[in-house]
């Protein structure tokens, strides 16, 4: 179990601390004396975790989506992609490590894979800019998609970002234009593309690599135009809580599936993807494989037409 506990997991954390204490006593003072009680407490902790995660509200799901121990892009690549060769740079300005990508084999299929990487510790978070991509990151994504077309390869995107980087230098280098061009390339791509929202799907920074034929989302991930805290500040001037904003925004996987913004929810292990990363990544791999196999049977014209209709339908539903 991950050492990082969320606020709503505190009762579970207290119970697991007691289990750890009894385990130490059992090993030192009286070997085997507490085995029965330890097993009982472990079963109770598992039941508590299962019940808690079955009844998460929108704000709790937001916290889970941001959990630092959820699988990251580099983890998905290590688990699902063989012979991965990273490609760097946008051939215009620099290499942005907030978006990583390259070529590899996914369950025997040659693919182009790309995604946001947030980093896990201070050094890697700074290296990857906490997943906030700059213009060159999106231009690198465009370059990767152009390679996919050249070699007739499907594209798999992993989305996990709070948004594009809003700094002055980023604006000076045209981040809005880069996001727009990347979104356009996703929509007009002549090969199949699938996006998986694995944690946070924030604003244009997310949709720039998620305007795809199929959009999948993990059970406790979120997808929105702005973070709940930002919406609360802008729309309600801080008069509401972030939790109230999250509920009003309809950002959960379940809300998004009902509104047909995402195509499929991928179930997470009890306790979230961070509690069993291997099982979570296996589930993602199975879902992506199924979607890619269906899309590979379609020609370029059909792929583009279906993609366009998918996003037109989202716009039409918002006007009703």
From Swiss-Prot:
Record's subcellular location: Cytoplasm
Protein name as annotated: Acetyl-coenzyme A carboxylase carboxyl transferase subunit alpha
Transmembrane regions listed in the UniProt entry: none
Any GO MF annotation of the entry: acetyl-CoA carboxylase activity
Pfam family, one: ACCA
EC number of the protein: 2.1.3.15
Keyword entries, A-Z: ATP-binding, Cytoplasm, Fatty acid biosynthesis, Fatty acid metabolism, Lipid biosynthesis, Lipid metabolism, Nucleotide-binding, Transferase
InterPro entries membership: Acetyl_CoA_COase_a_su, ClpP/crotonase-like_dom_sf, COA_CT_C
Role summary: Component of the acetyl coenzyme A carboxylase (ACC) complex. First, biotin carboxylase catalyzes the carboxylation of biotin on its carrier protein (BCCP) and then the CO(2) group is transferred by the carboxyltransferase to acetyl-CoA to form malonyl-CoA.
């Amino acid at each position: 179990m991950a050492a990082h506990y969320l606020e709503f997991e505190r009762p579970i954390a207290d119970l697991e601390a007691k289990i750890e204490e009894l385990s130490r006593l059992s090993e030192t003072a009286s070997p085997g004396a507490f085995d029965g009680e330890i097993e009982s407490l472990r079963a109770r902790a598992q039941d508590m975790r299962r019940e808690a995660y079955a009844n998460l509200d929108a704000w709790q799901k937001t916290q889970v989506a941001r959990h630092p121990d959820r699988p990251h892009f580099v983890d998905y690549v290590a688990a699902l992609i063989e012979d991965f060769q990273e490609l760097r740079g946008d051939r215009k300005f620099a290499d942005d490590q907030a978006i990583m990508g390259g070529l590899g084999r996914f369950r025997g299929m040659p693919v182009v894979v790309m995604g946001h990487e947030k980093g896990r510790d201070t050094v890697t978070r700074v290296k990857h800019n906490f997943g906030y991509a700059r213009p060159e990151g999106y231009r690198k994504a465009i370059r990767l998609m152009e390679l996919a077309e050249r070699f007739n390869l499907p594209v798999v995107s992993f989305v996990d970002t709070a948004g594009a980087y809003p700094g002055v230098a980023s604006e000076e280098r045209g981040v809005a234009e880069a996001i727009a061009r990347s979104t356009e390339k996703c929509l007009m791509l002549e090969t199949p593309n699938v996006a998986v929202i694995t944690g946070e799907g924030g604003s244009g920074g997310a949709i720039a690599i998620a305007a795809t034929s199929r959009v999948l989302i993990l059970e406790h991930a979120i997808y929105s135009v702005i973070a709940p805290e930002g919406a609360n500040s802008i729309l309600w001037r801080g008069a509401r809580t972030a939790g109230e904003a999250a509920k009003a925004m309809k950002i959960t996987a379940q809300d998004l599936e009902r509104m047909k913004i995402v195509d499929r929810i991928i179930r997470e292990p009890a306790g979230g993807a961070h509690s069993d990363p291997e099982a979570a990544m296996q589930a993602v791999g199975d879902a992506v494989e199924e979607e890619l196999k269906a899309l590979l049977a379609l020609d370029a014209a059909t792929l583009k037409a279906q993609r366009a209709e998918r996003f037109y339908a989202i716009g039409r539903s918002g006007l009703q």
